[in-house]
């Protein structure tokens, strides 16, 4: 199916300072949740643009706060990659927060950044802070829902950021921000390991791919930080097949693109510098998180 994107519209400009990230639509209450990184807030906006702060999860030092976030439609919870706390679960109804994983072999993470969950409840999350092209020590970890064990899943990366899994759970995709590319690997052993990791898509200019969403056909919607664009990448050859521009020239910090809305056919884009949230109708619905095929 050809991708058709409608007009990009601004849903809201969020008051305050600091970056916003992690747009996550909750179908139970119709709000789009997002994080205010430096302030430590999990906030939300209604579909008519009304904003409210929802839950303060904390941000020690003003930077060690929440970053990536997804809505787990199976368990009806928000999952948050928190730079200081690790991976945290938050119930939107009760506001009960619980740390799922806070360390690896007794040592705190460098700072989790983004995450995804598979159909079995296993969580994959990136840990990029303190890494660079010259010091590629970033990792993607896998938390096992059955055993509670955490393993280093992908290593030696230059600021790994957004993480996604293909609809058939055969591939994992990671935005390697420091190298300005999207990496892809085959999942093996039922998702417990990976093989044949390679660069799928390179970008030129800008700072790097940040976070991304996926539609039902497996296309990636990559928010590129520094460009003010979302690149739609087809998964077979890694080619850019569409470019979505945000309408404000100064809004170049496009840090995430995720699906939501009543029919899951609205793409929500967060922009960090101007604290804008955009929405755009799309022809192919987004992939539910987690995606559990019928039957």
Protein language model features and the residues they cover:
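Predominantly a core beta-strand signature of beta-propeller blades
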Residues: 7-10, 50-54, 95-98, 148-151, ...
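Beta-rich, blade/repeat-based domains predominating
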Residues: 14-29, 58-84, 105-123, 131, ...
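Short loop/turn segments immediately following the C-termini of beta-strands
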Residues: 37, 82-83, 128-129, 177, ...
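A short loop-to-beta-strand structural motif that recurs across blades of beta-propeller domains
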Residues: 41-43, 86-88, 138-141, 181-183, ...
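Blade-level signature of beta-propeller repeat domains, shared across WD40, Kelch, NHL, RCC1
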Residues: 256-295
């Amino acid at each position: 199916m050809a991708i058709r994107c409608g007009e990009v519209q601004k849903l809201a400009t969020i008051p305050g300072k600091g970056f916003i990230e992690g747009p996550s639509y909750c179908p139970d209450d119709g709000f789009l949740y997002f994080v205010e990184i430096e302030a430590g807030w999990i906030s939300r906006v209604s579909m008519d643009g009304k904003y409210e702060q929802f839950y303060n999860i904390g941000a020690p030092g003003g930077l060690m706060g929440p970053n990536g976030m997804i809505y787990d439609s199976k368990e009806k919870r928000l999952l948050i990659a928190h730079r200081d706390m690790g991976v945290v679960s938050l119930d939107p109804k009760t506001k009960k927060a619980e740390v799922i994983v806070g360390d690896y072999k007794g040592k705190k993470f460098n700072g989790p950044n983004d995450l995804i969950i598979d159909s079995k409840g296993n969580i994959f999350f990136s840990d990029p802070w303190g890494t660079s092209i010259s010091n590629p020590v970033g990792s993607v970890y896998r938390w096992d829902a059955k055993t509670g064990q955490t393993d280093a899943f992908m290593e030696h990366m230059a600021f790994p950021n957004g993480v996604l899994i293909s609809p058939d759970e055969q591939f994992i995709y990671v935005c390697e921000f420091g190298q300005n590319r999207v990496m892809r690997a085959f999942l093996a052993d039922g998702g417990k390991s990976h093989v044949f990791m390679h660069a799928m898509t390179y970008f030129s200019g800008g700072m790097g791919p940040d976070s991304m969403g996926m539609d039902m056909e497996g296309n990636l919607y990559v928010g590129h930080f520094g460009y003010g664009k979302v690149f739609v990448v087809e998964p077979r050859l890694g080619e850019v097949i569409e470019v979505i521009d945000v309408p404000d020239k100064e809004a170049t910090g496009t840090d995430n693109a995720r699906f939501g809305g009543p029919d899951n056919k609205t793409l929500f884009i967060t922009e960090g510098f101007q604290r804008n949230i955009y929405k755009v109708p799309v022809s192919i619905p987004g992939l539910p998180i987690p995606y559990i095929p019928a039957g």
